[in-house]
Amino acid sequence: SVPGPMGPSGPRGLPGPPGPGPQGFQGPPGEPGEPGSSGPMGPRGPPGPPGKNGDDGEAGKPGRPGERGPPGPQGARGLPGTAGLPGMKGHRGFSGLDGAKGDAGPAGPKGEPGSPGENGAPGQMGPRGLPGERGRPGASGPAGARGNDGAAGAAGPPGPTGPAGPPGFPGAVGAKGEAGPQGARGSEGPQGVRGEPGPPGPAGAAGPAGNPGADGQPGAKGANGAPGIAGAPGFPGARGPSGPQGPSGAPGPKGNSGEPGAPGNKGDTGAKGEPGPTGIQGPPGPAGEEGKRGARGEPGPTGLPGPPGERGGPGSRGFPGADGVAGPKGPAGERGSPGPAGPKGSPGEAGRPGEAGLPGAKGLTGSPGSPGPDGKTGPPGPAGQDGRPGPPGPPGARGQAGVMGFPGPKGAAGEPGKAGERGVPGPPGAVGPAGKDGEAGAQGPPGPAGPAGERGEQGPAPGFQGLPGPAGPPGEAGKPGEQGVPGDLGAPGPSGARGERGFPGERGVQGPPGPAGPRGSSQGAPGLQGMPGERGAAGLPGPKGDRGDAGPKGADGAPGKDGVRGLTGPIGPPGPAGAPGDKGESGPSGPAGPTGARGAPGDRGEPGPPGPAGFAGPPGADGQPGAKGEPGDAGAKGDAGPPGPAGPTGPPGPIGNVGAPGPKGARGSAGPPGATGFPGAAGRVGPPGPSGNAGPPGPPGPVGKEGGKGPRGETGPAGRPGEVGPPGPPGPGEKGSPGADGPAGAPGTPGPQGISGQRGVVGLPGQRGERGFPGLPGPSGEPGKQGPSGSSGERGPPGPMGPPGLAGPPGESGREGSPGAEGSPGRDGSPGPKGDRGESGPAGPPGAPGAPGAPGPVGPAGKSGDRGETGPAGPAGPAGPAGARGPAGPQGPRGDKGETGEQGDRGFSGLQGPAGPPGSPGEQGPSGASGPAGPRGPPGSAGSPGKDGLNGLPGPIGPPGPRGRTGDAGPVGPPGPPGPPGPPGPP
């Protein structure tokens, strides 16, 4: 028969009831599986948010005083500086130069060395040891002649730091010596303890305001001034008592956010941490009931592999089920995790082998259907061969307890089987019927251990991340970086621009005079003072009338009565614009503007004039004598010469010339850092550098706010009096009493333009009337036009100091300065450590053979000198007869260095003599003359951090370095916001 197509996969069945068999024993724990290999690296995550701005860094250590540079060429004379603010209290003067080194006085008692600091935990600095007691100063001896420089001894190990002696009395100023070669830069010392702050100096009194001067024309750029002569150094002042702590200053304005710093160098890979402790193994879960094979679900996401579970015990033996009808072959389900090995089932009946069906096409993954009815149990198939034990799968989740099933039917009694081996005790069985008491059997031995499980398959995903290892020991403290050179003193910032003065309001335009009214025929009686009427609109000027004929002169009228004081007339029209006002007084200084944006880096400026040479620092205390050197290397074995007779001791030769300095030895490894010296006093402020080029004009500021109402303008000048009309004809009879004023007539229409008449005779001035009452306030005039800008006011006092600006980008390195003038010689320093062994000098000329002398007397034993460098083999003298070996006398005193003798004839080569015993190392001699500075060697390897108490005494304070060149003027920043409007100027 042809097999039909493969049917769809059935729905997943419900979990079956648990079998009636008893629960199996808990199996022994399985061996822990091997850790799975790391999975592939995941995709790179998105970049994290930018980090917060770091906290403000701590203040840097005080810079080491720079080496004294050569004085630069004389610069051009600088512009006269503006008057500075009252200066603060100056520093104490430097101590005077010491004279020539005197003979050492009797040494004071040596102070006990301070106890060294305790070594702290790794990475943390231990507490600093207490300083030893201060030794008494020895009496100052007379100034002795300077001795010749001895050869440099070998460097001994650094001795412990002794107590610092008190400073000696200042000696007389010695003659100026030649400038020595530039010494190599010393190693960085540890940061010293910060001293207590001194009391704040008194604030200087503000000077009186000067009279406003006239604006002068900008003067031409003056030549740079010559550097001033260095003042005589003062004596060291006694250290004053520490002043009380000054009041805390007002918090400064919040600075702008700093730009992100350059990425730091990649740090060294940290030490691999120790593996974390192994986690506690969890208890094994109970074996779940085997459910029916469900339909294949959609593949889920790859999960992380769980920890290897313990090996489960064997399950309970189930009852064989009844044979069911074989169903159609379903699709292959997913490979399940192998369950615990069950007991071997009883063999079933062999079924007929079915015909092999054709493999069906793989169907699409269907959605999970609703659960179908339970199918009938099929007949058991033939027993297959025992398969290889599968790899242990990951532990399954603990299943929910199944519904208690119904007990199965009681099976027929089977044939008794063969007696099996005694197994491990089973779980308690169900209570059976009471049987006969049997004989107690002996307890069987424990069963053999099961075979070790095979290694499970590698999980699809990387394992869980292990617990973090314990923290490693703290790393050693790094070597402190070299102290930076103190920066140049910045040039004084420019004074803030003075705010513009407000413009005075423009005076209004004067209105035209009104037309003259008609002259009355006769003078009426003065009427009552009327109330001031409303201000009428300004009329146009009427046409000028024709000049009438001159009438006859009338009789002189009687003098009229004094008029009553009239009411104040209406406010006149605004007068014409006044002339520009005088120069106003300087207004108050405006508030400091906000900090401008950071400007772009400026162009490279011209080098500024060199600053004056600083004062020489106080001499450092004499160092402790160096440790005894180690024995030198044995010299090469020379050729054996015939022993000549011992010659007499010759007189000491004259002092020879100082030989040429040998080549510079190899650079030694960095020694322990010395103690930080006291910071040098601030050098004198050099002359201001030349002004930078003016930056481009900034963009125009925003339109100013609308100005307030201007002050009331002055009353305009009185208009010209009108022309006097012709006198009227004389009236008949005597002058009657004045009549009452008639009602005001209606305004007439303007008449036609008349012919311009001739100018009338100017009338006599009338009497001055009484002052009228103040008039009512007139309507506010229109805002005046912008007047001409006033002349610039005087320079106001400097405004308050603004907040510190952002640090500009580092400028380019300045050009190398010209060599400076020779400094005054410092006093002789203490003997330095023994230098590296130099190279062998050139071979000297052979000496002339000396005459054999009689053996000299045995001299007193002298101190062993430093081991000299191996000189070239000199010429051997003529072989003399072997003399008798005399007793070894004590070593004589070290003779003075003799002059180089004339070149002798080359002698015969002698036989090699026996090697003498190595001499004991001698005491350290005085320092030799410094050779010329060699090329800068490669940086040495970082030394291990030094311990407290082992550093040397503070060295002398070096002279302040020359003033660096003034940097270029940066670009002009954006204009600040407009200042508040100034006060109105005088009218």
From Swiss-Prot:
Biased composition (Basic and acidic residues): 53-67, 894-905
Ranges of compositional bias, category Gly residues: 309-318
Tissue expression summary: Expressed in bones.
GO cellular component: extracellular matrix; extracellular space
Region span, Disordered: 1-987
In-chain residues carrying the UniProt-annotated modification 4-hydroxyproline: 15, 18, 20, 29, 32, 35, 50, 65, 71, 80, 86, 113, 116, 122, 131, 137, 158, 167, 170, 197, 200, 212, 218, 227, 233, 236, 251, 260, 263, 275, 284, 299, 305, 314, 320, 338, 347, 353, 359, 368, 371, 380, 389, 395, 407, 416, 425, 428, 446, 468, 474, 480, 486, 492, 504, 513, 526, 532, 541, 559, 574, 580, 601, 607, 610, 619, 625, 643, 652, 661, 673, 679, 688, 697, 700, 721, 730, 738, 747, 765, 774, 777, 783, 798, 804, 810, 819, 825, 846, 849, 852, 918, 921, 939, 954, 960, 975, 978, 981, 984, 987
Modified residues (Phosphoserine): S95, S589
Glycan-modified residues: K89
PTM remark: Contains mostly 4-hydroxyproline. Proline residues at the third position of the tripeptide repeating unit (G-X-Y) are hydroxylated in some or all of the chains.
Residue list for modification 3-hydroxyproline: P687, P959, P974, P977, P980
Location of this chain's protein in the cell: Secreted; Secreted, Extracellular space; Secreted, Extracellular space, Extracellular matrix
Family membership noted in the UniProt record: Belongs to the fibrillar collagen family.
Chain's role: Type I collagen is a member of group I collagen (fibrillar forming collagen).
Full protein name: Collagen alpha-1(I) chain
Organism annotation: Glossotherium robustum
